[in-house]
């Protein structure tokens, strides 16, 4: 709308990838806005199915797909680009402000959850120091610029989120990341979702992405459950691709080849469908309740 374009929406209340691509063909859509793998995976499946049937969708008009809110894996991006060369923009931000972006095309492949920070964005450690590139230290992402004065009638949350650092007012919504030597960052996840197990911090999004690297896995959510020995233990709720079959132990072993062993789930629970919010965002409340119910 800001560039004078026309906004087109699909009529379904629930997401239907086939209807989306049909509308792209009909209206010659140039830009699509999605929410990570929750939308991108069904879109890819629809393209693959149509191509295998000998009736591929005409998506030549698409120049840009923009995503935010949910992790968009590099594997899915790469597979989408096999159907059509376009720009895939993965944006990182919150209600309080934009933080960074990652742009992928056939000529510019990128890694999952790797972003380049916007100007005026910093990463500050829990010790209150700016994180040095390449140090491996985790920190909270802060954005400056148009920073709100606070949340309406919530002084406690306002004080936690909006702070001064080196004389500049920043918004720290709670997202943690590490910064690489080249200035790009690896997003770890929201601190409020962090799982504390045996004295170590584990971010659900990092574990989810490792699990989803398995060809057998369609979707998953990771939560922390109370544990007498470890404080919390990592539990994954997983749905598999059609006609896929993998055991809990095999998937655990696979995950340990992608991330440190202490981050791997102590339990993997298989479900028919991983429930998400209508906008594709993670429903950790459902996942935790499902995990408690299955393990009780």
Feature map (PLM): residue ranges:
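Short Gly/Pro-enriched turn/cap motifs at secondary-structure boundaries
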Residues: 110-116, 161, 167-168
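Beta-strand->loop->alpha-helix junctions that form or flank phosphate-binding loops
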Residues: 89-96, 113-115, 223-225, 269
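AMP-binding/adenylate-forming catalytic core of the ANL superfamily
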Residues: 22, 37, 93, 144, ...
